[in-house]
Design a protein with these regions (language model features):
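PRPP-associated nucleotide enzymes
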Residues: 4-7, 16-18, 22-244
Length: 244
C-alpha cells in the first residue's frame, strides 16, 4: 500500500530535526503516569530496562505483555458501563459491563507484545494495525512514514492506540491521523510503556482535547538519535531481533 498522504513539516527540538505534522495550540488532557504509585508494575518496568535481563527476548516480550495487561485493567476504568442481568444456576445477578465498543489500535512491529497484553483483557475488541517507521535522512534527521493500515470503522467507538515507546510522539500522531481515515472515534486513549516528556508535550498540542494518555513511566529527555533516556533501547529489536 502506498504511503498515506498526511501533511508533515520540519520540526526541530533539542538540536534534533524531525519531520512532524503541523503544530496546534497546546491544550489540557488527562495524563496518567502509573509509575507514580508503587505496584508490581515497577518490577516489570525494571526488567525491561535492565541491560542484562532484556537480552532474553522471550522474557522481554512477556514483560511488555504483562505491562499491557496491567494498563488494560487501569484503562478499563475510563470506559462507560451498563447494567446487565446475568442468569446464574441459582438466580439472576446484575453486573456492570463495558458499554463501549473498543478497538485496539497498534503500531507495528514493536507494539505487538503490548497489543497481546491489552487483547488478553479486551478480548472482545476489534483490532487495527498501522505500520509507522523512521526513514532516516541523516544520522539525526528522519521522517516518520506510514505505509500500511488495516482497521474497522471507528465512528462512535473507543480507540485504544498502544505503542510501547512514545519517544517524539510523531509516530503516534501520524498513526492516529491514518486511523481517522476510517472514521472519528468517540473516545481516544493513547497508551505507552515509556514516554519522553517531549512526546507528552507534543501529544498535548496534536491530539484532541479529550484524549487520555496512559504511561507506565515518563522519562525526562531524548538523546541525539531521538531515543528516550534512560529508556530501554529499541523495543522492536529487543522483541524481535535487529532489523537491517
Amino acid at each position: 500500500m502506498a504511503a498515506f498522504e498526511i501533511g508533515i513539516k520540519q520540526f526541530q527540538c533539542s538540536g534534533i530535526i524531525f519531520l512532524s505534522s503541523c503544530c496546534q495550540i497546546p491544550k489540557f488532557m488527562k495524563i496518567v503516569n502509573l509509575s507514580e504509585n508503587n505496584t508490581i508494575l515497577n518490577r516489570f518496568i525494571a526488567e525491561i530496562r535492565d541491560v542484562n535481563i532484556q537480552r532474553d527476548s522471550l522474557r522481554f516480550r512477556r514483560n511488555i505483555e504483562r505491562i499491557g495487561e496491567i494498563m488494560a485493567y487501569e484503562i478499563s476504568k475510563e470506559l462507560s458501563y451498563e447494567s446487565v442481568s446475568v442468569t446464574t444456576p441459582n438466580g439472576i445477578s446484575t453486573e456492570s459491563l463495558p458499554a463501549d465498543t473498543v478497538v485496539l489500535g497498534t503500531i507495528l512491529r514493536a507494539g505487538l507484545p503490548l497489543h497481546a497484553g491489552f487483547h488478553n483483557y479486551f478480548d472482545r475488541a476489534d483490532n487495527a494495525f498501522v505500520s509507522a517507521y523512521r526513514k532516516y535522512i541523516s544520522d539525526n534527521e528522519f521522517e516518520v512514514v506510514v505505509e500500511y493500515l488495516a482497521s474497522p470503522r471507528l465512528d462512535g467507538k473507543t480507540l485504544l492506540l498502544v505503542d510501547p515507546m512514545l519517544a517524539t510522539g510523531i509516530s503516534a500522531d501520524l498513526s492516529y491521523r491514518a486511523l481517522l481515515t476510517k472514521g472519528t472515534p468517540a473516545k481516544t486513549v493513547l497508551a505507552c510503556v515509556i514516554a519522553s516528556q517531549q512526546a507528552i508535550d507534543y501529544a498535548l498540542s496534536h491530539f484532541p482535547d479529550d484524549t487520555i494518555i496512559y504511561c507506565a513511566a515518563i522519562d525526562p529527555i531524548l538523546n541525539e538519535h531521538a531515543y528516550i533516556v534512560p529508556g530501554l533501547g529499541d523495543a522492536g529489536d529487543l522483541c524481535f531481533g535487529e532489523k537491517e
